[in-house]
Design a protein with these regions (language model features):
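Phosphate/dinucleotide-binding and metal-coordinating scaffold of catalytic cores
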Residues: 1, 8-196
Length: 196
């Protein structure tokens, strides 16, 4: 089954309307001081604890590790798994530490996507994904350039504007969207810098 991923990022405040009155959800919304690209209430959800990681199948472990390595997400560790279980489904949450290059585009060079390795030994699945290289080709084939372009085309301007100078033109914002797609596309080229 496909894995759905919802991203939460915290920048400038944007009010969120919800009719869900669960205390925990209301508290999370109140504590979120930023733009939420995706936010979903998972009824009855609970954190997957570090001591439960051994029960997670290798396929899921490889897929999560591969995705985190692609987007350079360093925030899925033994101390902070950032995974939940709700109604027999596992959810990979909180991708706020992904794509760290976006905070300093001036430092991004043509070769940056290829140079950015990934410290897999820090990842919660770093020692569990024994067949990551076997999964690599299959997972990379699922991500095409048109898919990346389609995904970035859906990023709202208000999500990108806080990362750019005030008054940035719509044309420049669109170029930034395409820069995300280009960065990830270059990371996907074989041999991938985060595999091996």
């Amino acid at each position: 089954a496909p894995t759905e991923i919802y991203t939460l990022s915290l920048h400038d405040a944007l009010p969120i309307q919800s009719d869900i009155q669960e205390d925990e959800f209301v508290d999370l919304l109140a504590a979120s001081h930023g733009i939420n690209l995706g936010f979903q209430y998972l009824e009855g959800a609970r954190d997957i604890r570090a001591d439960e990681i051994a029960t997670i199948d290798e396929e899921f472990a490889c897929k999560v590790l591969w995705l985190d390595a692609l987007v350079m997400n360093v925030d899925r560790t033994v101390h902070n798994p950032n995974m939940m279980r709700s109604q027999q489904q596992r959810w990979v949450i909180d991708h706020g530490a992904a794509l760290p290059f976006q905070y300093n585009w001036a430092a991004v060079m043509e070769e940056s996507p290829r140079r950015s390795a990934y410290a897999m030994h820090h990842h919660i699945f770093g020692d569990r994904a024994k067949n990551l290289e076997r999964w690599d080709k299959h997972l990379a084939a699922m991500v095409s350039k048109p898919i990346l372009q389609s995904v970035v085309s859906q990023i709202p301007d208000c999500f990108l504007q806080p990362l750019m100078p005030r008054g940035t033109s719509a044309k420049t914002i669109e170029r930034r969207r395409q820069a995300y797609a280009a960065f990830l596309w270059k990371r996907l080229k074989s041999p991938r810098p985060f595999i091996g």
